[in-house]
Design a protein with these regions (language model features):
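Long, low-complexity, charged/polar intrinsically disordered regions in eukaryotic proteins
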Residues: 1-13
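C-terminal regulatory/oligomerization modules of transcriptional regulators
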Residues: 1-4, 113-142
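N-terminal helix-turn-helix DNA-binding core of bacterial DNA-binding proteins
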Residues: 10-51
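N-terminal positioning helix adjacent to the helix-turn-helix/winged-helix DNA-binding module
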Residues: 22-25, 41, 82, 93, ...
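Canonical helix-turn-helix DNA-binding module
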Residues: 42-77
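Residues within the alpha-helical elements of helix-turn-helix
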Residues: 48, 86, 103
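Basic, amphipathic "hinge/linker" alpha-helix immediately C-terminal to the N-terminal HTH DNA-binding motif
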Residues: 75-94
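Arg/Lys-rich, alpha-helical DNA-contact motif
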Residues: 91-125
Length: 142
């Protein structure tokens, strides 16, 4: 079967979605590492994601081009203002999904693992509903 533009469209979207997930995961990780250790180095990201130094470097370079991270050779990695905003949104979205999973009886370990994947694929509408249900459960439990 010959490849046409319409055949490759789903694959292009999948690659774009994976690229976005990676960006979100990396800015969230940089924020977490900076909070925990006061600075983030390339080796910290490679260790955090269990990837090679080369892979982490390639992703950091891409995120620099996208204006999410800034760094210089042998210097710590920092979040730009744009990167900080994305990290905050990602952390909030992650926490809502995690709390929702806990509220429906999922154990903490499974909820933490599942939230990592779900957070990237939940629509804003669904996320709002998750948040409403979590808040309703919290107010009922108080």
């Amino acid at each position: 079967m010959a490849r046409t533009a319409s055949n490759s469209t789903p694959h292009q979207r999948t690659r774009r979605d994976h690229s976005t997930e990676t960006a979100e995961d990396y800015v969230e990780a940089v924020a977490d590492i900076i909070t925990e250790r006061t600075s983030c180095r390339l080796v910290d990201l490679a260790e955090y994601f269990a990837v090679s130094h080369v892979t982490a470097n390639r992703i950091v370079a891409r995120l620099q081009k996208e204006g999410l991270l800034s760094t210089e050779p042998y210097q710590p990695i920092e979040l730009t203002a744009k990167g900080k905003r994305l990290a905050v949104r990602c952390r909030q979205r992650h926490e809502i999904v995690y709390q929702f999973l806990l509220s429906i009886g999922i154990d903490e370990q499974t909820a933490a693992i599942d939230a990592e994947g779900i957070e990237h694929h939940v629509s804003p509408k669904t996320l709002r509903r998750f948040e409403e249900l979590v808040q309703r459960n919290e107010s009922r439990d108080s």
